[in-house]
Amino acid sequence: MSCLPALDKFLQNYHQAYLTSLGELPRYYPQGEPSVCIQGEFHADLDQAVSWQPVKREVEGSFANVEHALELTLWPEINHFYGQYFSAPLLFDSKWGTGELLQVWNEDDFTCLQQNLIGHLMMKKKLKQPPTWFIGLLDEGDKMLTINNSDGSVWIELPGEIPTQQLSPSLAEFIGALSPRIAPPVKHEELPMPALEHPGIFASFKRMWQNLFGKR
Protein backbone atom coordinates (compact mmCIF):
# COMPACT_ATOMS: atom_id res chain seq x y z
CA MET A 1 0.00 0.00 0.00
CA SER A 2 1.40 3.39 -1.01
CA CYS A 3 2.02 5.94 1.73
CA LEU A 4 0.91 8.77 -0.56
CA PRO A 5 -2.80 8.84 0.46
CA ALA A 6 -1.76 8.91 4.13
CA LEU A 7 0.77 11.68 3.45
CA ASP A 8 -1.81 13.67 1.47
CA LYS A 9 -4.27 13.41 4.35
CA PHE A 10 -1.69 14.31 6.99
CA LEU A 11 -0.66 17.42 5.05
CA GLN A 12 -4.29 18.49 4.76
CA ASN A 13 -4.91 17.89 8.46
CA TYR A 14 -1.66 19.64 9.35
CA HIS A 15 -2.58 22.91 7.74
CA GLN A 16 -6.19 22.73 8.85
CA ALA A 17 -5.02 22.26 12.45
CA TYR A 18 -2.97 25.46 12.29
CA LEU A 19 -5.78 27.40 10.64
CA THR A 20 -8.31 26.17 13.20
CA SER A 21 -6.13 26.72 16.27
CA LEU A 22 -4.13 29.82 15.31
CA GLY A 23 -5.98 31.26 12.34
CA GLU A 24 -2.81 31.18 10.25
CA LEU A 25 -0.61 28.89 8.18
CA PRO A 26 2.30 27.12 9.87
CA ARG A 27 5.53 29.11 9.93
CA TYR A 28 9.12 28.05 9.37
CA TYR A 29 12.62 29.56 9.44
CA PRO A 30 14.03 29.04 5.91
CA GLN A 31 17.39 30.60 6.85
CA GLY A 32 17.79 32.27 3.49
CA GLU A 33 16.62 29.29 1.41
CA PRO A 34 13.88 30.08 -1.16
CA SER A 35 11.01 27.69 -1.81
CA VAL A 36 7.78 27.56 -3.76
CA CYS A 37 6.19 26.71 -0.40
CA ILE A 38 6.62 30.26 0.92
CA GLN A 39 3.43 32.30 1.13
CA GLY A 40 3.85 36.06 1.11
CA GLU A 41 7.06 38.07 0.92
CA PHE A 42 10.45 36.45 1.31
CA HIS A 43 13.74 38.24 1.89
CA ALA A 44 16.74 35.94 1.93
CA ASP A 45 18.80 38.44 3.92
CA LEU A 46 16.25 38.72 6.75
CA ASP A 47 16.29 36.24 9.60
CA GLN A 48 12.56 35.70 9.96
CA ALA A 49 9.98 32.95 9.83
CA VAL A 50 7.74 32.60 6.79
CA SER A 51 4.26 31.20 6.32
CA TRP A 52 4.24 28.14 4.13
CA GLN A 53 2.12 25.44 2.56
CA PRO A 54 3.10 22.25 0.72
CA VAL A 55 3.38 22.31 -3.06
CA LYS A 56 3.07 19.18 -5.15
CA ARG A 57 6.02 18.73 -7.47
CA GLU A 58 5.39 18.80 -11.21
CA VAL A 59 7.91 15.99 -11.69
CA GLU A 60 8.39 13.40 -8.95
CA GLY A 61 11.81 13.42 -7.33
CA SER A 62 13.86 10.34 -8.18
CA PHE A 63 16.43 8.37 -6.20
CA ALA A 64 17.72 6.46 -9.22
CA ASN A 65 21.10 8.17 -8.87
CA VAL A 66 21.39 6.95 -5.27
CA GLU A 67 20.48 3.42 -6.33
CA HIS A 68 23.04 3.54 -9.12
CA ALA A 69 25.79 4.93 -6.87
CA LEU A 70 25.25 2.26 -4.23
CA GLU A 71 24.14 -0.58 -6.52
CA LEU A 72 21.13 -0.96 -4.23
CA THR A 73 17.39 -1.03 -4.95
CA LEU A 74 15.57 1.24 -2.51
CA TRP A 75 12.13 0.43 -1.13
CA PRO A 76 9.83 2.29 -3.56
CA GLU A 77 8.04 4.29 -0.86
CA ILE A 78 11.05 6.61 -0.74
CA ASN A 79 9.86 8.19 -3.99
CA HIS A 80 6.35 8.75 -2.63
CA PHE A 81 7.51 10.11 0.72
CA TYR A 82 10.23 12.49 -0.46
CA GLY A 83 9.50 12.93 -4.16
CA GLN A 84 5.91 14.18 -4.27
CA TYR A 85 6.00 17.49 -2.37
CA PHE A 86 8.07 20.46 -1.44
CA SER A 87 7.34 21.08 2.24
CA ALA A 88 8.82 22.14 5.55
CA PRO A 89 9.36 19.44 8.20
CA LEU A 90 6.09 18.21 9.73
CA LEU A 91 5.77 18.13 13.51
CA PHE A 92 3.67 15.38 15.06
CA ASP A 93 2.35 13.84 18.25
CA SER A 94 2.00 10.07 18.55
CA LYS A 95 1.72 7.22 21.03
CA TRP A 96 5.50 6.86 20.64
CA GLY A 97 6.20 10.49 21.52
CA THR A 98 6.67 13.77 19.67
CA GLY A 99 8.76 14.12 16.57
CA GLU A 100 8.93 15.36 13.02
CA LEU A 101 8.69 13.95 9.55
CA LEU A 102 11.38 15.21 7.22
CA GLN A 103 10.42 16.74 3.91
CA VAL A 104 12.17 18.59 1.09
CA TRP A 105 12.17 22.41 1.07
CA ASN A 106 13.59 22.96 -2.43
CA GLU A 107 15.69 21.25 -5.10
CA ASP A 108 18.97 21.97 -3.31
CA ASP A 109 17.49 20.39 -0.20
CA PHE A 110 16.60 17.32 -2.25
CA THR A 111 20.20 17.06 -3.45
CA CYS A 112 21.43 17.30 0.15
CA LEU A 113 18.96 14.61 1.14
CA GLN A 114 20.36 12.29 -1.53
CA GLN A 115 23.96 13.00 -0.47
CA ASN A 116 23.25 12.34 3.17
CA LEU A 117 21.20 9.26 2.37
CA ILE A 118 24.23 7.89 0.52
CA GLY A 119 26.36 8.67 3.57
CA HIS A 120 23.89 6.93 5.87
CA LEU A 121 23.69 3.82 3.68
CA MET A 122 27.47 3.67 3.29
CA MET A 123 27.79 3.81 7.07
CA LYS A 124 25.29 0.96 7.42
CA LYS A 125 27.33 -1.08 4.94
CA LYS A 126 30.56 -0.25 6.77
CA LEU A 127 29.01 -1.46 10.02
CA LYS A 128 27.72 -4.60 8.25
CA GLN A 129 24.13 -3.68 9.13
CA PRO A 130 21.00 -4.08 6.96
CA PRO A 131 20.20 -0.95 4.91
CA THR A 132 17.70 1.58 6.24
CA TRP A 133 16.71 5.09 5.22
CA PHE A 134 15.51 7.87 7.47
CA ILE A 135 12.12 9.57 7.42
CA GLY A 136 12.23 11.66 10.58
CA LEU A 137 13.21 12.18 14.18
CA LEU A 138 11.66 11.24 17.50
CA ASP A 139 12.04 12.73 20.99
CA GLU A 140 13.70 16.01 19.98
CA GLY A 141 16.12 14.36 17.59
CA ASP A 142 17.60 11.76 19.91
CA LYS A 143 16.22 8.90 17.82
CA MET A 144 15.89 8.40 14.08
CA LEU A 145 12.78 7.09 12.40
CA THR A 146 13.91 4.75 9.65
CA ILE A 147 12.51 2.41 7.03
CA ASN A 148 13.73 -1.17 6.76
CA ASN A 149 14.72 -1.25 3.11
CA SER A 150 13.83 -4.93 2.73
CA ASP A 151 10.15 -4.74 3.71
CA GLY A 152 9.16 -1.07 4.25
CA SER A 153 8.49 -1.36 7.99
CA VAL A 154 9.10 1.64 10.30
CA TRP A 155 11.61 1.45 13.14
CA ILE A 156 13.35 3.50 15.80
CA GLU A 157 17.07 3.62 15.14
CA LEU A 158 19.94 5.06 17.15
CA PRO A 159 22.92 6.29 15.12
CA GLY A 160 25.38 3.48 14.51
CA GLU A 161 23.11 0.78 15.88
CA ILE A 162 20.78 -1.84 14.42
CA PRO A 163 17.08 -0.88 14.81
CA THR A 164 15.47 -2.85 17.63
CA GLN A 165 11.95 -1.41 17.99
CA GLN A 166 9.44 -1.73 15.17
CA LEU A 167 6.69 0.90 15.22
CA SER A 168 4.62 -0.07 12.20
CA PRO A 169 4.61 -2.66 9.40
CA SER A 170 4.31 0.09 6.78
CA LEU A 171 4.92 3.79 6.27
CA ALA A 172 1.27 4.32 5.35
CA GLU A 173 0.08 2.87 8.66
CA PHE A 174 2.68 4.85 10.57
CA ILE A 175 1.69 8.20 9.06
CA GLY A 176 -1.96 7.34 9.65
CA ALA A 177 -1.26 7.00 13.38
CA LEU A 178 0.20 10.52 13.71
CA SER A 179 -1.49 13.75 14.77
CA PRO A 180 -0.30 17.22 13.73
CA ARG A 181 1.54 19.09 16.49
CA ILE A 182 1.00 22.83 16.66
CA ALA A 183 4.12 24.70 17.74
CA PRO A 184 5.87 28.01 17.07
CA PRO A 185 8.70 28.00 14.53
CA VAL A 186 12.13 27.22 15.90
CA LYS A 187 15.33 28.54 14.38
CA HIS A 188 17.86 25.72 14.12
CA GLU A 189 21.55 26.29 14.58
CA GLU A 190 23.77 25.92 11.55
CA LEU A 191 26.27 23.06 11.60
CA PRO A 192 29.87 23.71 10.56
CA MET A 193 29.69 20.92 7.97
CA PRO A 194 29.32 21.66 4.23
CA ALA A 195 26.95 18.74 3.63
CA LEU A 196 24.43 20.16 6.09
CA GLU A 197 23.99 23.67 4.71
CA HIS A 198 20.31 23.44 3.87
CA PRO A 199 17.95 23.89 6.83
CA GLY A 200 14.93 22.22 5.26
CA ILE A 201 16.17 18.83 6.36
CA PHE A 202 19.51 18.79 8.01
CA ALA A 203 19.28 21.34 10.77
CA SER A 204 16.80 18.86 12.21
CA PHE A 205 19.50 16.22 12.11
CA LYS A 206 22.07 18.18 14.14
CA ARG A 207 22.37 15.77 17.06
CA MET A 208 22.01 12.69 14.92
CA TRP A 209 24.73 13.64 12.46
CA GLN A 210 27.08 14.80 15.21
CA ASN A 211 26.73 11.39 16.83
CA LEU A 212 27.01 9.54 13.54
CA PHE A 213 29.86 11.39 11.87
CA GLY A 214 31.46 13.56 14.53
CA LYS A 215 33.61 10.82 16.04
CA ARG A 216 35.07 9.31 12.86
Swiss-Prot record:
Keywords: Cell inner membrane, Cell membrane, Membrane. The lineage of its organism: Bacteria, Pseudomonadati, Pseudomonadota, Gammaproteobacteria, Alteromonadales. It is found in: Cell inner membrane. This is Protein Syd. Belongs to the Syd family. The keyword Transport does not apply. It comes from Shewanella baltica (strain OS195). InterPro entries: Syd, Syd_sf. It is a peripheral membrane protein. Interacts with the SecY protein in vivo. May bind preferentially to an uncomplexed state of SecY, thus functioning either as a chelating agent for excess SecY in the cell or as a regulatory factor that negatively controls the translocase function. Its main location: membrane. Disulfide bonds: none annotated. HAMAP family: Syd. CDD domains: Syd.
